[in-house]
Amino acid sequence: MILFITACENGPVEYKPESGSVSGKVTFQNIDNWPSSSSIAIALSLYWPPQGAPAAFTSISYDSLIINQNVGSYNYIFENITLNRAYGSIAVSWKDPNDNNSETNQHVLGAYGGSLAAEFWDADSIMLTDDIYEIENLDFIVDLD
């Protein structure tokens, strides 16, 4: 009889994620001003201010809001996001239905870390890495007034 015994190292297992995710909640104030035409979207953009196509985006419908009085909230998540790079912003925008120019028809309504007083130029960037590949609670407020 031959007996083979093998052992493995008891060190930590290193997990290398292939992609990451960011998530949070957008609180919409004054939702009675929700646009009746056109659309509102949330996007994760590579640059700030946004230039070109976003890394990820989704449309937000009025029906998808959790409504309490005149405030609505929307929980978002962007998954399968490329790691080891910075993203310029997460922003909510409104598409002007009377402007066909894709470079001027999106109007920023709010951005993560940004303030209306600074016209959202102070939006925070987001960095996903092999070590920090899931970022949660990137919450911000959009006032539709």
Over which residues does each language-model region extend?
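Bacterial Sec-dependent N-terminal signal peptides
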Residues: 2-29
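Predominantly extracellular/luminal cell-surface or secreted proteins
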Residues: 27, 41-49, 90-96
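Short, ordered, surface-exposed loop/turn motifs in non-cytosolic proteins
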Residues: 31-58
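Tryptophan-paired
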Residues: 49-87
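A short, solvent-exposed beta-strand micro-motif common in secreted/extracellular proteins
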Residues: 83-101
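Structured interaction patches on ligand/partner-binding surfaces of diverse proteins
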Residues: 95-137
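Conserved "repeat-terminator" motif of extracellular CCP/Sushi domains
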Residues: 138-145
